[in-house]
A protein has these predicted regions:
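C-terminal helix-coil-helix/basic helical segment that borders enzyme active sites and/or dimer interfaces
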Residues: 28, 32-35, 282-318, 331-339
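Glycine-rich phosphate/cofactor-binding loops in nucleotide/flavin-utilizing enzymes
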Residues: 336-384
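Glycine-rich beta->alpha junctions and the first turn(s) of the following alpha-helix
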Residues: 185-186, 191-281
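Glycine-rich flavin
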Residues: 42-50, 54-151
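Generic structural signal for well-ordered, non-transmembrane alpha-helical segments
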Residues: 238, 274-281, 313, 317-324, ...
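Short segments within alpha-helical structural elements
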Residues: 325-332, 363-367
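A short core secondary-structure module
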Residues: 144-177
Length: 384
């Protein structure tokens, strides 16, 4: 049986819905407390749960919103414009949630009929899984688990003793969590490490991505890592747009010490701001056009080509890097105003420079894409 979602994100065809705007306002208001406590506040998590944000990409038959991915990206951008950590947690949960669509129908239903459900994960450090007593025996250590403090399910990949990889789903109370998240940016994601030892996991809670997914649609055709690539780039776009808004407000009233002009009157500031705005618009158009073009093809053909994979990989990485440049320009324009911790632009600066350090933002991918352009041979891997 399903349940009734509060209409924050439900059927968000018009993104100006009053309830969605109210949710965005609450995200912005909650951000300082979230930053201080290094986790999303409970009240905000409850609102996000009931909005359907954590199940935005799950099919309606399993009580999800089943949002088109292009529309989902727009929502992530708008959340990130208010607070990067909230957008990061929502996106991490919503995208990794789609891996549950390889589980049996009964388990998918069990997960998502719970109105409070959300999934957290992390990249593997040392993780092994083997067949045992009709199930699987799992020992592993994973990191960077954004949103794990409010998750109802954990999942993580592990190397299978018989070859390849498997992902296991298990409850948070079956894992040990290590608070290693003492960082400068994206503080409120609370991205702890987690581990299990000799955990017996039922076979029905194990995913083999070499098998066909239980649900077959455009979302399960898109590689999960590449969905993360373009959706984390969407987070970057929201952060960068917010930084531009911040510096415009600063420029309205600031007259730097010993300067002849206010920032808003300074031709250099105007030029830098114009360039930053153009770069943001170019990055936004590039990401959204690439995503729409590839997803439309995947929707029609139920397959993704190497060329399309390369397009998503390139768009995700490039846009993250461009957004950092935009934020840096805004930060430079702000002068000493931008250095204070209570200044919103400072938080965006820190958040953006954590995003660039993420595996999805690595500039080394450009080399892979260049080799593909020259040779026509695409190197598939966990991130490509």
């Amino acid at each position: 049986m399903g349940f009734v979602l509060l209409p924050f994100l439900k059927k968000v065809i018009d993104l100006e819905l009053e309830n969605f705007v109210s949710l965005l306002d609450n995200i912005a208001k909650s951000a300082p407390l979230a930053e201080q406590s290094r986790r999303l506040p409970d009240q905000l998590v409850t609102e996000l749960r009931m909005s359907g944000a954590f199940r935005a990409l799950i099919p309606k038959k399993f009580s999800g919103l089943e949002l088109p991915f292009e529309q989902y990206l727009d929502i992530i951008k708008r959340i990130a414009e208010q607070d990067a950590s909230t957008a990061w947690c929502v996106n991490q949960a919503a995208v990794i949630a789609t891996t549950s669509l390889w589980l049996p129908d009964q388990i998918i239903s069990e997960i998502w009929e719970d109105p409070f459900a959300s999934v957290a994960n992390g990249p593997p450090y040392s993780c092994n899984i083997s067949s045992d007593d009709g199930g699987y025996r799992l020992t592993g250590h994973w990191g960077f688990s954004s949103g794990c403090q409010h998750a109802t399910w954990m999942t993580g990949p592990a190397r299978f003793s018989e070859g390849g990889w498997r992902s296991a789903f298990f409850r948070p109370d079956q894992a040990q969590f290590d608070d290693t998240w003492h960082v400068a940016g994206l503080r409120a994601t609370g991205s702890f490490e987690f581990r299990v030892k000799d955990l017996l996991v039922p076979a029905t809670q194990i995913v083999n991505f070499d098998d066909d997914s239980t649900v077959k649609n455009d979302i399960t055709t898109l590689p999960t890592a590449l969905m993360f690539a373009i959706s984390f780039a969407a987070v970057g776009l929201g952060v960068a747009k917010g930084a531009l808004s911040d510096v415009i407000k600063i420029a309205q009233g600031k007259k730097p010490q010993w300067a002849a002009l206010r920032l808003r009157e300074d031709p250099d500031v105007q030029r830098f701001l114009g360039k930053a705005t153009a770069r943001w618009r170019s990055a936004d158009t590039y990401l959204m056009h690439t995503a729409a073009e590839v997803i439309d093809s995947v929707r029609r053909n139920q397959e993704i080509s190497h060329s399309q994979r390369s397009q998503l990989r390139m768009a995700g990485t490039h846009v993250i890097q461009e957004c950092a440049e935009v934020v840096d320009l805004a930060y430079k324009i702000s002068g000493s105003t931008g250095i204070y911790q209570d200044e919103l632009l400072q938080r965006r600066f820190q958040d953006m420079h954590v995003i660039t350090q993420h595996v999805q933002g690595r500039e080394s991918y450009f080399g892979l894409l260049g080799r593909y352009a020259i040779s026509g041979d695409y190197e598939t891997g966990p991130m490509t």
